[in-house]
Amino acid sequence: DPAILQGFNDLILQQNIPAVVAAMEISSPINYVGNINARKAPVYFSNNWDDDLFKPNSILDMFSQLTGPKHLDLLAGIHMSAEISGLLGLPGLPWDNVHSWFDYWLKGINNGFMSQPAVTMAVKHTSDTTTFASWPSSTVATKTFYLGPRAFNPSGKGTLNNSANLVSFTDAILSGLDTLATSGQVPVIAQLLEPVVPITVSMSAISVVNGIVYQSGALSSGIKLRGIPKLNIWITPSLAQAELVVYLYDVDSTGTGTLITHGPVSLHSATPGKTIQLSMELTATAWDVPAGHRLAIAIDTYDPLYSVPTLSLYTVGFPLSAGKQSVLTVQYVN
């Protein structure tokens, strides 16, 4: 399709973006939820946690808006990796469920599929699954961590705290070089292998010049993350264009962080030197952080998975004070 090719080229060259978005809106199924609901059409979703083409966040959003019969499986892997077994003639959960779905809705076979919970989430790096009767779910709670400044902390890290920050300080990072915080050194390959080869980093090795880390204390009871982590953060970019990539880590007693999820945000028309508040989502996840481990976020300005909005050097300040609270919120189950 020439229109799709033109849109792809425009994205690469960062031009005609409003026109690209408008063109893509036409083919986005979330814009037809009203029609689907009016027909009460049954909808089955299968999606993977690290799918960078169809993020689970958007799937969860659409799923939550549907009012008719629906089912969602969120599995480990990247785009199509959980489904590829069926293409090879091998068994797999998505294909088994698709057959059961069609048997029920097209053949009228009462196979009990619709009596199952509507949402199944594979817990990353385990063989466990979590089920929910619906999404959003009343069984999912939210926990807030308040960012505390790095300032002159001997550890070189900021903090994630249970109570509001009362210290006034502005930390800053410089663009131009990547840090060891990454979604994977080799895009696609790293994400493909991630279910069996976790992406890890020594948290103390993340550059304090080009990145910043905020870390919690040891968690006394652990936490079972289920859903979408969100970061509301105050920043001061020195240029109109900038990029931030936020990584969420499970940090063990040795200081090694295992990547849980991440999320990027690009600025294209900021006012240089003006402090703004960013609200961003990280990619949805299901992850069990053991007791005694810590949660941490690392922030830098580059990741090999994403193009950058500018090649010029810039700084990003992170002002914190009693009047400017930056917070990380995570969804979890007991």
Positions of the model-derived regions?
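Accessory cap/linker subdomain of secreted extracellular hydrolases
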Residues: 1-38
